[in-house]
C-alpha cells in the first residue's frame, strides 16, 4: 500500500471507518518462517499440554531464558521470535497460538513496531486484530499485553511508545478478558528516564536485573487454573 494510501487508511481507522485488519494487510511476515517452523518441529517432538500460559512476541520474550524458573509451578510456554512486530504474532497465531489452547497469552510487542515507523494508533489496531484472531478460536483466553518498555537506545521514541501504551491500556479496560501489564513506570528512575542498570550493553535488551523486575510485575497477572 503506497504511503499516501496508508495515511488515508489510518485516518479512516481513527474515524471508525475502516476494519482494523486493513491497516496491516501489507505487512510481510515471511522472514520469520524458519523460526516458526522450528517451533512446530519442537511441538511434534513434545507438544505442550493445553491450558498453559503462552508468552509470545519479540526479543524481550525470546531472550527470557529463565522464564520457567521465574514462574515455578506455572505451565509457561515461550514462543518469542526476536525483531517481530504485533502483526507477526497475529500472522502466525494459527501455528503458534491456537494449537496450544492456552488459557492465557502474554504478549510483548510494539517496541519494534514504533521503531519501524508505525503510529500509536496502528499499534492499537494491530493489537486489536491479534485479540480478534485469538478469541476467534479461543474465546475464553485471557490476553495480557506487557507495556512497550522504555529503553535507553529508543528513548527518542518514548512519546509515541507512551501514547501506544495508553491506547492499549484503555482498550484492555473495556474487556474483562484483556489485561494491561504496566512495566513502563517501574523501569524509570528518579530522573524520569530508563534505569541503565536494567539493560544489556546495547541499551535495548534486558539483563538479569531487568528480567527480575519484569518477573515481579508480571507474576500477579498470571492466571492460575480455576
Predicted regions and their residues:
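Cell-envelope and extracellular/periplasmic
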Residues: 80-84, 106-119, 128, 132-135, ...
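A short helix->loop->beta-strand "cap" motif at the edges of active sites that frequently abuts
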Residues: 138-142
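N-terminal secretory targeting modules
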Residues: 1-55, 61, 65, 69-70, ...
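N-terminal cationic-hydrophobic initiation segments that often serve targeting/anchoring roles
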Residues: 68, 97, 135, 169-173, ...
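Catalytic His-Asp segment of secreted/periplasmic serine-dependent ester chemistry enzymes
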Residues: 152-226
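Conserved beta-strand scaffold positions in the cores of enzyme catalytic domains, especially
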Residues: 55, 76-78, 180
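Charged helix-capping and loop-helix junction motifs
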Residues: 121-128, 160-165
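Oxyanion-hole/transition-state-stabilizing segment in secreted/luminal serine hydrolases
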Residues: 61-77, 86-124, 144, 148-152
